[in-house]
Amino acid sequence: MLSILLSLLSLSGTHAAPISKDNGTVCYALNSSTTDESIFPLLNGQGPHYDYPQSFGIPVEVPDQCTVEHVQMLARHGERYPTASKGKLMIALWDKLKEFQGQYNGPMEVFNDYEFFVSNTKYFDQLTNSTDVDPSNPYAGAKTAQHLGKYIAYNYGDLFSDSNPVFTSSSGRVHQTAKYVVSSLEEELDIQLDLQIIQENETSGANSLTPADSCMTYNGDLGDEYFENATLPYLTDIKNRWMKKNSNLNLTLEHDDIELLVDWCAFETNVKGSSAVCDLFERNDLVAYSYYANVNNFYRRGAGNPMSNPIGSVLVNASYNLLTQADELDNKVWLSFSHDTDIQQFISALGLIDNGVTEYSLDQVDFQNIQQLSWVTPMGGRIFTEKLKCGNASYVRYIINDVIIPVPGCTSGPGFSCPIEDFDDYITNRLNGIDYVSSCEVQQVSNTTELTFYWDYNEVEYNGPVSNK
């Protein structure tokens, strides 16, 4: 139990690294870092994990008169390297930056004697772990996953049964994250869990943790298209500031290069624990970047994309069915692992952060209205759905990255939870008129029209294969 309690420090913004193992108990020492963790929420979910930044002040502890009788989790993989496609762009930009033999001045002097942070391209797409990054790095994806396992064990350990299923998509980094969490849970609870690998491909149809794969009408480029003819002044300001001290260099920096360097800052922090590239940017630069990135997210995966709610409804409907059938089901814990895209579409369909705004300004930062989808899905992001038993009544509440996010218009229960009868009405209204199969024209690629793996995993063999991405 001591090891679990100590590891919780890492899940509330303080990171810890194992230093010894005595009598089976792992002890943790706080790992100091020069990294400014306050910028993590501004990096569009590409940097290390952080708590959800907007808290209503609601205690995350279970209300005194209640117990948790059923819990679900939908989690993103832990911290990773850039994808192969983004990594190639970074290498091309690095080639452009390093071809100059002179000295950079001003903010760009970080590139004097700089060494590219990915030592081998084979690491692209992969989870960061102690075999390929400095073990003292507090933000390694493997560490985040191990700590998450301890967090789950501490909060929900008494709900587990032996051979409890855990569900992961077949992506390599997602599967590896799930394995680290499972290993941590098995060690803490002395049980054996049953890992189910749900295939990521378009033929899976609705029986998937990644239902966007089978949505033939989904346009994932809608966010980029919204920006197609836009000029973002903040990028011009950054470029002018950098080049003012380097006017002698024959260097052409495009706006895409500047945005890519924010990504660079995030991913290098995942890999090395810190990044000098982050020092290129002033805080206001990152505030503007975060705003425009979340506008892109809104149209790419959020309520601004007409297919987000149909896609997200697959997992919302499955979650709701698990809740309503909780008394009859053998398992009380349902853990699932997927990607940020799928979680953002789930949140969009669920409506937890939907403020009703349908269009955003590209001329200036619209602080009052932006939906911060990236706050839901940092690396290692997770959403817990709890069903509480309080006396003779049941209630539902959501915990996003360790912060209670109330169900809109449904907060009359203990700890601002939602009475189950009112929750039924809320979900019915959210899903009314939404049909994933017809909206997505799923039957072009698959005849599978329902999600069944939560119910038939004992009869159907869900075992991958696992991809390298």
Swiss-Prot record:
Organism: Kluyveromyces lactis (strain ATCC 8585 / CBS 2359 / DSM 70799 / NBRC 1267 / NRRL Y-1140 / WM37)
Glycosylation sites: 23, 31, 129, 201, 229, 250, 317, 392, 447
Enzyme Commission number(s) from the entry: 3.1.3.2
Similarity comment: Belongs to the histidine acid phosphatase family.
Keywords: Glycoprotein, Hydrolase, Secreted, Signal
Higher taxonomy: Eukaryota, Fungi, Dikarya, Ascomycota, Saccharomycotina
Full protein name: Repressible acid phosphatase
Induction: Repressed by inorganic phosphate.
Matching PROSITE patterns: HIS_ACID_PHOSPHAT_1, HIS_ACID_PHOSPHAT_2
Localization: Secreted
Extent of the signal sequence: 1-16
Gene: PHO5
Post-translational modification comment from the UniProt entry: Glycosylated during secretion across the membrane.
Transmembrane segments: none
Alphabetical list of Gene3D superfamilies matching this protein: Phosphoglycerate mutase-like
InterPro entries: Acid_Pase_AS, His_Pase_clade-2, His_PPase_superfam, Histidine_acid_Pase_euk
Molecular-function GO terms, alphabetical: acid phosphatase activity
UniProt enzyme class: hydrolase
The reaction(s) this protein catalyses: a phosphate monoester + H2O = an alcohol + phosphate
Catalytic site positions: 77, 340
Pfam families, alphabetized: His_Phos_2 (PF00328)
Any one annotated GO CC term: fungal-type cell wall
